[in-house]
Amino acid sequence: MNREEFLRLAAVGYNRIPLACETLADFDTPLSIYLKLADQPNSYLLESVQGGEKWGRYSMIGLPSRTVMRVHGYHVSILHDGVEVESHDVEDPLAFVESFKDRYKVADIPGLPRFNGGLVGYFGYDCVRYVEKRLGVSPNPDPLGVPDILLMVSDAVVVFDNLAGKMHAIVLVDPAEEQAFEQGQARLQGLLETLRQPITPRRGLDLSGPQAAEPEFRSSYTREDYENAVGRIKEYILAGDCMQVVPSQRMSIDFKAAPIDLYRALRCFNPTPYMYFFNFGDFHVVGSSPEVLVRVEDNLVTVRPIAGTRPRGATEEADRALEDDLLSDDKEIAEHLMLIDLGRNDVGRVSSTGSVRLTEKMVIERYSNVMHIVSNVAGQLREGLTAMDALRAILPAGTLSGAPKIRAMEIIDELEPVKRGVYGGAVGYFAWNGNMDTAIAIRTAVINDGELHVQAGGGIVADSVPALEWEETINKRRAMFRAVALAEQTSAK
């Protein structure tokens, strides 16, 4: 873009204009670019592995954000350079998020990657209370105390093309600032200069040595209490209160390693469609979620329910036998079909009449430690609605709550001992162009005050076996704790 085009866009009324440059980056990786450009508070790295086995084409590296929104309950704080510049008590924090995003009138420049910045971060599980007032405030203690919503204004991002070995660096420029075009171009050149510098070496992760033992964890439940909670849910199901509930346990350990080393280990042990590393300054969120919560791209709304789990086998033959066993398990199939129906209902709430389709039904996807049954539901976003409307309709996922959803969440409030926080919420972005991509916050660690917390659960139906449900939660956290052990082992050397 030249200066004349920049000024033309400013005259039209855009208050943010993307400036971009493209460069070969075949000697770099998304991780090395993050460490060179963005390894500071309020930054992020987003990567993807499709179907558990193939790296996605694009990775996104968010440079440190100067403006951040933090929401606790109904109180909203906007911080700029770490200083609170706005403070609001609001009736609907989700409406505030949308109105805040609308302050940014960003020009859509042809040829740029489909994601070139936006509001990036998470919406916690308890954001459902902004929509479903019947649930009230969380009745459970909140030992983590992290925000219910945390979003960074991502106005400088690098999009790495893993296939072509090149990258786009994109910065948003406010045309009202003095010498805005020249300052934006200078910032891009500064980023390129930084990329040319060698990276400070980090200690390698030793994958050939003896495998570190998984750390012992402290649970929010005893095993007996968790199995009793499963039994109580089965009583509710038999009484006709609900068809399924998804309880969870939080597992916590002391953690002294560098959070980025945990991400490095996790992307090795458990590559998934949604991999993320967030440095929020006072805490980190590190995850490898297999499951989209809701995606809106060019007005197509997509959810992808995952339900039905088996551990991975030691051989291909064992994997196939486990797949056959999973697909012939009446309990797992019934649970999955229930969640397909819930997904259709959720997508239908914001889609044009007759547009909702089941585009994939009960396929198996394999991950490092487990395999899942997966389906795909899509619909055309109804005219007049936005990506935020889709989030309102679908958060939290049925796979993290149950069916019917509201009654299941009331039972979760009754039986779980702590507020869920990030777990079970949405991690991802609202792009400037109106698109949205969010993952369910599962297989996710919150690192806070020298402790690491990971939460896992499972869907309970009428014929669930309490002992097996406990074991399922242990299997689901195994990749994370294996990564924790390697990160700790590396830091101790």
Swiss-Prot record:
Annotated GO biological process: L-tryptophan biosynthetic process
Disulfide cysteine pairs (residue numbers): none
Entry's cofactor comment: Binds 1 Mg(2+) ion per subunit.
Pfam families recorded: Anth_synt_I_N, Chorismate_bind
Cross-referenced InterPro entries: ADC_synthase, Anth_synth_I-like, Anth_synth_I_N, Anth_synth_I_PabB, Chorismate_C
Cofactor: Mg(2+)
Pathway: Amino-acid biosynthesis; L-tryptophan biosynthesis; L-tryptophan from chorismate: step 1/5
Residues annotated for L-tryptophan binding in this entry: 48, 273-275
Protein EC: 4.1.3.27
Catalytic function, reaction form: chorismate + L-glutamine = anthranilate + pyruvate + L-glutamate + H(+)
Function text: Part of a heterotetrameric complex that catalyzes the two-step biosynthesis of anthranilate, an intermediate in the biosynthesis of L-tryptophan. In the first step, the glutamine-binding beta subunit (TrpG) of anthranilate synthase (AS) provides the glutamine amidotransferase activity which generates ammonia as a substrate that, along with chorismate, is used in the second step, catalyzed by the large alpha subunit of AS (TrpE) to produce anthranilate. In the absence of TrpG, TrpE can synthesize anthranilate directly from chorismate and high concentrations of ammonia.
Family stated for the protein in its record: Belongs to the anthranilate synthase component I family.
Matches recorded under NCBIfam families: trpE_most (TIGR00564)
Record-given protein name: Anthranilate synthase component 1
Gene label: trpE
